């Protein structure tokens, strides 16, 4: 599901009921809402006929209900109920990384994807052939997770989120982030970091830990779902990098996660420090904070996540200094920094390197805006000269 909850951004399952009748299992790559937002609805639709298992990693199982319940609290258009959430969870079968599950002669294996805690690529093997769906994937690695495993396959279904962009290095991203925090807080301002509750939030905690020595004592405020989702990370410390584990064990961060005091947003906006709030596209609580700090040049908003076109985060990142929102007009006088190095997605150079190593017979490009996906297609054609490269439309079937 999209960050918006209307029209074409909603799932179109009812239009594809004939295709859904043959579904034997649902495999989930990770717990971000654009990948699992409609799963309770899908389970309800499939349940009219039979019980279909949902395969995912244990961390994904633990994170999904947090995302669903938040959706139910804030959406204006419900496609499922809290009862559907409970029924969907009953269908979940946790699968370990590299553990294979057989479904009617097909072997399914989940492979680390490096995108966020519990994220997985899906390897499907049948009749001597291998298909891999990367899901959202990070071949470079991040502050919190090791790089994605590179899986050989005859058919690769790969994301194209950054098919037309390259990221700065992690080292550069951390250094720039530290410089922004140090300068803004040093002048008595507030640094707002809008994050996705799962993935980017924990990256920023790790970045803060890495630059803490330079910052000194800086007040830290955590809002939105970040606290609840980060608590899940503590259950799976063995899946995290050493740097991320050390960050989560830092009392400066862990005290805020487990024992953070409750302040009004107005109080925090008048203080100085770092505010980490959902959502990453400057929606929800983060937008409320932004309304309060945007008019003061001493403050800063640091954009560290993908921004869907037309979202407030996208408009601000493109230099818009006047936002017309349902709740009123916001004049943007604060500092705006865009840091791409914290991304949980591979950029085109990493994906091209992977495709060149694997050299699949078929490459299917998905999960990208039109400009990004066709830029990725053009680049992939230069690397996979003998391969069939497809960009399917919504609802379009492909014969392999």
What kind of feature is each model-predicted range?
Residues 180-304, 309, 366:
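Hard-cation-handling environments
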Residues 1-27, 32-36, 40-215, 219-221:
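His/Asp/Glu-rich metal-coordinating catalytic cores
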Residues 324-353:
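Generic long, charged, amphipathic alpha-helical segments
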Residues 137, 169-173, 251-264, 279-282, ...:
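A general structural motif
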Residues 295-334:
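Redox- and metal-dependent alpha/beta enzyme cores, enriched for Fe-S-associated oxidoreductases
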Residues 125-127, 148-150, 207-213, 237-238, ...:
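Short, solvent-exposed amphipathic alpha-helical segments in soluble enzyme
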Residues 374-397:
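Short acidic, glycine/proline-enriched helix-loop-strand junctions
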Residues 355, 359-365:
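Proline-aspartate-enriched helix->loop->beta-strand connector
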């Amino acid at each position: 599901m999209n960050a918006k909850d209307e029209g074409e951004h909603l799932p179109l399952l009812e239009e594809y009921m004939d295709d859904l009748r043959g579904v034997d299992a649902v495999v989930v790559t990770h717990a971000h809402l654009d990948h699992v937002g409609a799963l309770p609805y899908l389970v309800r639709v499939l349940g009219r006929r039979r019980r279909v298992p949902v395969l995912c990693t244990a961390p994904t199982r633990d994170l999904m209900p947090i995302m669903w319940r938040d959706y139910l609290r804030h959406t204006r258009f419900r496609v499922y109920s809290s009862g559907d959430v409970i029924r969907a969870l009953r269908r979940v079968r946790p699968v370990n990384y590299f553990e294979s599950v057989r479904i009617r002669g097909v072997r399914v294996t989940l492979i680390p994807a490096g995108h966020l805690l519990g994220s997985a690529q899906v390897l499907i093997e049948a009749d001597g052939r291998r298909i891999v769906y990367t899901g959202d994937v990070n071949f470079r690695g991040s502050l919190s997770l090791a790089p994605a495993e590179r899986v050989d396959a005859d058919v690769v279904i790969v994301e194209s989120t950054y098919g037309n962009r390259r990221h700065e290095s992690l080292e550069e991203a951390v250094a720039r982030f530290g410089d922004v925090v140090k300068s803004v807080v040093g002048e008595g301002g507030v640094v707002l970091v809008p994050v996705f509750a799962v993935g980017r939030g924990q990256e920023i905690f790790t970045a803060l830990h890495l630059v803490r020595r330079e910052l000194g004592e800086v007040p830290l405020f955590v809002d939105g779902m970040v606290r609840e989702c980060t608590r899940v990370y503590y259950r799976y410390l063995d899946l995290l990098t050493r740097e991320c584990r050390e960050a989560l064990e830092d009392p400066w961060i862990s005290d805020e996660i487990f024992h953070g005091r409750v302040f009004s947003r107005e109080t925090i906006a008048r203080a100085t420090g770092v505010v980490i709030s959902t959502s990453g596209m400057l929606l929800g609580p983060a937008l409320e904070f932004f309304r309060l700090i945007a008019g003061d040049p001493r403050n800063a908003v640091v954009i560290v996540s993908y921004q869907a076109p037309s979202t407030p985060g996208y408009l601000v990142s493109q230099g818009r200094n006047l936002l017309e929102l349902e709740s009123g007009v916001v004049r943007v006088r604060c500092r705006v920094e865009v840091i791409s190095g914290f991304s949980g997605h591979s950029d085109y150079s990493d994906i091209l390197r992977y495709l060149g190593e694997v050299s699949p017979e078929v490459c299917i490009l998905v999960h990208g805006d039109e400009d990004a996906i066709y830029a990725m297609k053009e680049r992939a054609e230069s690397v996979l000269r003998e391969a069939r490269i497809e960009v399917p439309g919504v609802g379009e079937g492909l014969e392999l």
